[in-house]
Every structure is written in structure tokens, then in C-alpha cells.
A protein has these predicted regions:
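Periplasmic-binding protein-like
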Residues: 44, 121-128, 196, 200-239, ...
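Ligand-binding clefts/hinges and TM-proximal coupling segments of bilobed small-molecule sensing domains
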Residues: 24-28, 153-171, 211-212, 242-274
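Extracytoplasmic small-molecule ligand-binding "clamshell" domains
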Residues: 27-102, 236
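Flexible hinge/capping segments at coil-to-helix
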Residues: 29-31, 129-146
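Short helix-initiation/N-cap motifs at beta->coil->alpha
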Residues: 78-89, 133, 171-183, 220
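Extended ligand-binding regions for polar small-molecule ligands
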Residues: 23-25, 63-72, 132, 139, ...
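C-terminal motif of bacterial Sec signal peptides marking the signal peptidase cleavage site
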Residues: 18-21
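A ligand-binding cleft/hinge motif common to bilobed small-molecule-binding domains
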Residues: 86-89, 103-112, 157-160, 183-186, ...
Length: 274
């Protein structure tokens, strides 16, 4: 092989190795926290768990939890805002260590990832406008248009319930719940399916506009997602969460953002509509 060709191949291989490292977090250890930083992927449009305030700063229950978690672990936290429909691909690509973004624990997700013990009780509800006939059950959605956030458990539930309940309605899918609630207020859609924590936040924000009109339809508590191989790291996170639960920090954050404590005695018997 000519020397010129060897040099060219060496350069090409060097570029390939450089590009492989771009966009991923790497450390000299298998411990994701070896660099002293906990990186967290989050969808910053999911009020009140993670969103931007008037100063464009990240705020919300999960944001406060992430800070407390990092402090408990003795590291710094770095947020990586990510679109929800690509957030798990980013985790597998090692663009961050965890997904901390209001993620429901489901059997399907547990086949591809590890998830911590739940830190927040959660289930799906139907939201109606105050000036309309309330949809108390999926059957009441017949002939209506329902808004959901794309690729969420509410999205899957809205599609599955059409078959399970033998009812026909249209599902409009939004990139952010903020857009779905704006569409509901503007009468572009008739109802919303979403997590109860999100629904209660919006109904508290605008009690004359929105109302939670159904019972909780599912049980899908929220946890932190890590890569399947990071079993020891997952247990490390569980230990930190236990400490925050025992010292009252989780309760404090829950009262701040939800006005009630939804972090204790969480039902872990999954009931996911899919």
C-alpha cells in the first residue's frame, strides 16, 4: 500500500472517531457520574413538571427534583432540552445520563430501559371545557376531537380506547400540552387526555375554562429513565430518591407545585391503557 494511501486512511479514521464522539457524554469510567455531572434529558414544554418561565429559565417540579437529586449525589446537574419524540433515542445515544421528564413507568418502557422506583403518582384523565358538557367516560367522547401530546401514554390510550370502548372520535396530536390546552380553550378541540398532574395544574390556572371531567383512567406512576445496562446507576438513583423522600424534600416540592403530596405511598401496580 502506498504511503499516501495510508496517510489518507489514517486521516479518515481519525475524523470518523472524532465524529463518533460528538454529541455524546463520555467518561473514562462506566460510572455516568464519574465526571461529577448528572446530565438529564428533559422536554421543556410540559407544565408544571418542566417548562420555561418568563426569563426563559427552566423551572418545574422535575427541575427542582433534578437539582435536589444532584445535591444528594454530590454532583452538578446539566439539563439537555430535547423534543419528547426523540428523548429516548438520545438516552441510548448517551447524549445524557437520564431522562427526567414526567415519564410514566410502563411495561413496554421497562423492556428497553431501566426505570427508578416511582417518585410521583400519576394516571390519565379527560379534561373538558367548563362551558361544555363534561366527558365523564371515554364513551362520552363519541364524535368529538380529543387533544393529546404526541408519543405519550395519553396518546396511546386515546387510540387504544377507541377499540376497547367501541367509540369513534378524532385524536389531534400536539408537540406540547401547552398547545393542546390553547386549542381546547379556543374551541378547536373538544377534550384533552393527559396526566392528572398536568390536568390539575391547568384547571387550577384557569378554573373558569378547564375541568377534570373523568375519574383517573389508568395507573402509571412517574419515574426516572436510565439505559438498560446502567443497573448499578439505577439503584444509586433509587437510594438518592429514598433519601429525598425520607427527609421531606419530595413532599416539599410536591406541595410547591401541586398543592398536595403525591409522592408518598404510590401504587406501583401498573394499569396502562395500550
Amino acid at each position: 500500500m502506498k504511503r499516501k494511501s495510508v496517510v489518507l486512511i489514517t486521516i479518515v479514521l481519525g475524523i470518523a472517531l472524532f465524529l463518533t464522539g460528538c454529541g455524546s457524554k463520555s467518561t473514562s469510567s462506566e460510572d455516568p457520574l464519574a465526571d461529577g455531572v448528572l446530565t438529564a434529558g428533559t422536554n421543556d414544554m410540559y407544565l408544571p413538571l418542566e417548562f420555561r418561565d418568563e426569563n426563559n429559565e427552566l423551572v418545574g417540579f422535575d427541575i427542582d427534583l433534578g437539582k435536589a437529586l444532584a445535591e444528594q449525589l454530590g454532583v452538578k446537574i446539566q439539563w439537555v432540552p430535547t423534543a419528547w419524540d426523540g428523548i429516548f433515542n438520545g438516552l441510548n445515544a448517551k447524549q445524557y445520563d437520564i431522562v427526567l421528564s414526567g415519564t410514566s413507568i410502563t411495561e413496554e418502557r421497562l423492556t428497553g430501559f431501566n426505570m427508578t422506583d416511582p417518585y410521583l403518582a400519576n394516571g390519565i384523565v379527560i379534561v373538558s371545557r367548563k362551558d361544555a358538557t363534561p366527558a365523564k367516560t371515554p364513551k362520552d367522547l363519541a364524535g368529538k376531537t380529543v387533544g393529546v401530546q404526541i408519543e405519550t401514554t395519553a396518546d396511546y390510550a386515546a387510540e387504544a380506547l377507541k377499540t376497547q370502548e367501541n367509540v369513534e372520535y378524532t385524536v389531534n396530536k400536539y408537540d406540547a400540552m401547552l398547545d393542546a390546552f390553547a386549542a381546547l380553550e379556543g374551541k378547536q378541540i373538544d377534550n384533552i387526555m393527559t396526566d392528572i398532574s398536568v390536568a390539575q395544574f391547568y384547571t387550577t390556572l384557569k378554573p373558569d375554562v378547564y375541568a377534570v371531567s373523568s375519574d383517573v383512567l389508568s395507573n402509571e406512576p412517574i419515574g426516572i429513565t436510565v439505559r438498560k445496562a446502567d443497573t448499578a446507576f439505577n439503584e444509586q438513583l433509587n437510594t438518592a430518591l429514598d433519601a429525598l423522600r425520607e427527609n421531606g424534600k419530595l413532599t416539599e416540592l410536591s406541595m410547591k407545585w401541586f398543592g398536595q403530596d403525591v409522592t408518598q405511598n404510590i401504587d406501583t401496580n401498573l394499569k396502562v391503557i395500550e
